Amino acid sequence: MYTPIPANTPAPTAPTSSMTSNSSSASNANTTSSSGINPRNRASGTPSNERARPASGISSFLNTFGIRQNSQTASSSAAPDQRLFGTTPSNSHMSVAMESIDTAPQQQEPRLHHPIQMPLSAQFHVHRNYQLPISISLTAPTTTDHQQSSAHNFEGNNVGNVQESLNQRQPNGTNNTTTSIISMAPAATTRNIVGGADGSTIVNNSQEMYKNLRHLIYAANQPNGTEILHLDLPATSAEESNNMFNVDEVTLKQRKDKHGLFSIRLTPFIDSSSTTNQGLFFEPIIRKAGPGSQLVIGRYTERVRDAISKIPEQYHPVVFKSKVVSRTHGCFKVDSQGNWYIKDVKSSSGTFLNHQRLSPASSLSKDTPLRDGDILQLGMDFRGGTEEIYRCVRMRIELNRSWKLKANSFNKEALQRLQNLQKLTTGVEEEDCSICLCKIKPCQAIFISPCAHSWHFRCVRRLVMLSYPQFVCPNCRSSCDLEASFESSDEEDESDVESEGDQLVDQLSVLMETSKDVDSHP
């Protein structure tokens, strides 16, 4: 390594001890190997070589600790110093030679200049607008060949390797995802799926039809949403079929959300009249999908967890932590008119719609239409349902945003009366929940304490249950008894009479005072 020395600095003296000479000789060898200087230039005995000895000693000292200086940085920084301090042309020529020699091995062994390539699903996951369509196989074996799957128009996604592809849009804006789908299943079970519906066309292998049921979520502009499903509807009357498929534009628009997707909401069904257990409890599930989509219903496993962790929750399959639910129990389907269907895919414990089984064990069922408010049950209790993992799943179905309550004049007036009550009691009009700091709006579950403070019930529920029946207001710290008995009707009548009597006394006192004032003035 070459380090320039200013002109006003005295040149270093020759070494006077054997220790110094030994260290300098060792440092020369290290300098030759580290900086890449030609040994022939070192043997020329120029003064620049002698000036480089102190710097080479520093480099040898650093090499003893495993620290290697960057020769390219030192050489690039040495050139300006040479121009500043007026070094000789020979020294400047040496610095150029050092740079050229140092850059040569770097070109032979280039460093990694590009970041680590993430899977395609991980790249899209960081964006808020997730790209559709999505295809996931919950039972296919794991593959690691990302490049092979990305060559297709619509990649086959496996557990642990979820690959999504962008919608190939033509210049006119249409979606070009209705081409053939090549599944990533093993070669022994190769399938040709036309139109994007899994299991629609299978050549000479009907038993493998739904063995690898795929979870398909299409975008809102998916054409031919009803045709690609290949629905196998039960025998119904002509009037029912016309009402199902002939939907006006106003109704169709109401079924879609702001992104043009249809939705389904599943909530636990609790039957208070039942003497047995109430089934598996789960949080409300909301899924959104475009026309022609197919949502898999199955069991939650580690493979499923790895697959769904890479996509947003609203596009997840419907999975439950219950062993009475098969790995691929069934599927939901939605057509272009927003009609939803349920299909049992050879489940062992069965699927029950409004307490009626769709198909026998290990057999396919028809695509049964769903209606808002239907009760769906997956499986039957095993071992009496004593353990939660062996309980069936009962749920209520709500379709296409029907659970969204619309605020009417009555709801708005009730909220306004509540706000006026708070203003009269506390003197301050509170519009926000003091726990979540969100506004209290109509059609929301609200808890009102005796001190006239209010919160969202889901926000204050833990405080209510913590010391029930006693409740301490988190706003004013007043305590009350939530189990206090109501006043009887007789006591209410007496209180009303007393209040009316007090009002009459007040009015009489006011009249007497006014009469005295009139008499005092002539």
UniProtKB/Swiss-Prot annotation:
Keyword tags: Cell cycle, Cell division, Cytoplasm, Isopeptide bond, Metal-binding, Mitosis, Phosphoprotein, Transferase, Ubl conjugation, Ubl conjugation pathway, Zinc, Zinc-finger
Localisation: Cytoplasm
Entry-annotated residues carrying Phosphoserine: S206
Amino acid composition bias (Polar residues), ranges on this chain: 36-49
Catalytic activity: S-ubiquitinyl-[E2 ubiquitin-conjugating enzyme]-L-cysteine + [acceptor protein]-L-lysine = [E2 ubiquitin-conjugating enzyme]-L-cysteine + N(6)-ubiquitinyl-[acceptor protein]-L-lysine
Gene: DMA2
Enzyme Commission code: 2.3.2.27
Zinc finger map (RING-type): 433-477
Coiled-coil region list: none
Pfam families: FHA, zf-RING_11
Function of the protein: E3 ubiquitin-protein ligase which functions in cell cycle retarding in conjunction with the UBC4 and UBC13/MMS2 complex, 2 E2 ubiquitin conjugating enzymes. Involved in nutritional control of the cell cycle. Required for proper spindle positioning, likely regulating septin ring deposition at the bud neck.
Start-end of Low complexity biased regions: 14-35
Domain (FHA) ranges: 295-358
PANTHER family for the chain: E3 UBIQUITIN-PROTEIN LIGASE DMA1-RELATED, E3 UBIQUITIN-PROTEIN LIGASE RNF8
Region (Disordered): 1-56, 69-92
Record protein name field: E3 ubiquitin-protein ligase DMA2
A GO cellular-component term linked to this record: ubiquitin ligase complex
Family: Belongs to the DMA1 family.
Top-rank lineage group of the source organism: Eukaryota
InterPro entries: Dma1/Dma2_RING-H2, FHA_dom, SMAD_FHA_dom_sf, Znf_RING, Znf_RING/FYVE/PHD
Enzyme class: transferase
Biological process annotations from GO: cell division; protein ubiquitination; ubiquitin-dependent protein catabolic process
GO MF annotation, one: zinc ion binding
Native source species: Saccharomyces cerevisiae (strain YJM789) (Baker's yeast)
Entry PTM: UBC4-dependent autoubiquitination occurs at Lys-211, Lys-258, Lys-288, Lys-310, Lys-333, Lys-343, Lys-346, Lys-366, Lys-406, Lys-412 and Lys-423. UBC13/MMS2-dependent autoubiquitination occurs at Lys-258, Lys-310, Lys-346 and Lys-366. Lys-211, Lys-256, Lys-288, Lys-310, Lys-343, Lys-258, Lys-366 and Lys-412 are also ubiquitinated in trans by DMA1 E3 ligase in association with UBC4.
Cross-link (Glycyl lysine isopeptide (Lys-Gly) (interchain with G-Cter in ubiquitin)), chain numbering: K211, K256, K258, K288, K310, K333, K343, K346, K366, K406, K412, K423
